[in-house]
């Protein structure tokens, strides 16, 4: 749970809002395979503002760099990308141009814990979207930011990152995932034992 203070600069009114973390759904949730329709409500609005704040908070809690609403069981065409200190919300996101040059790099996904796959993506993309204030944005993204945008846009279109990989790559990634999960469980058990000794 997180507390957010909002100050209306025209009236000077301060409002307090308690935000609850969103529930994150795993890879087999059917909503991850559904294309999300365009968001039609006028912006800004309190419902979208609250959803974006909760997406940002949840992404930060899971140490992610991107999170889409449908990963949390919410059928809204919005995602957030960014780091701990800077996040942007993308409502009705679109790619309007992309590089011919392709880059292959590792990607993970909060809905696929401890799983990583090499995925081909354009090195840059020109994108359009609305932020939670209703401002229309047209920007060029490159590198990791472009990769995150495209990964989350795939979620909006019902595409999972494993859909970009072949069966052998997925099998190898599953094996690495299993080993990593076992290591994390072992580390967690050892940490609990150490905590109980104090």
Specify the residue positions occupied by each region the protein language model found.
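Positively charged
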Residues: 1-198
């Amino acid at each position: 749970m997180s507390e957010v203070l909002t100050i209306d600069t025209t009236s000077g009114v301060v409002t307090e809002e308690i935000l609850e973390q969103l529930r994150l759904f795993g890879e087999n949730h059917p909503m991850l395979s559904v294309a999300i329709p365009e968001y039609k409500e006028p912006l800004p609005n309190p419902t979208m503002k609250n959803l974006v704040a909760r997406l940002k908070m949840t992404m930060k809690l899971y140490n992610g760099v991107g999170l889409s609403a449908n990963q949390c069981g919410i059928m809204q065409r919005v995602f957030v990308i960014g780091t701990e200190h800077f996040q942007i919300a993308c409502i009705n996101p679109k790619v309007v141009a992309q590089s011919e040059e392709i880059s292959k790099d590792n990607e993970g996904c909060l809905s696929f814990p401890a799983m990583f796959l090499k995925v081909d993506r354009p090195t840059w993309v020109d994108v359009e979207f609305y932020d939670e204030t209703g401002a229309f944005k047209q920007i060029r993204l490159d590198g990791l930011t472009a990769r995150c945008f495209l990964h989350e846009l795939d979620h909006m279109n019902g595409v999972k990152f494993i859909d970009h990989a072949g069966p052998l790559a997925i099998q190898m990634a599953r094996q690495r995932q299993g080993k990593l999960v076992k290591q994390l469980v072992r580390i967690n058990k050892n940490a609990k034992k150490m905590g109980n000794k104090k």
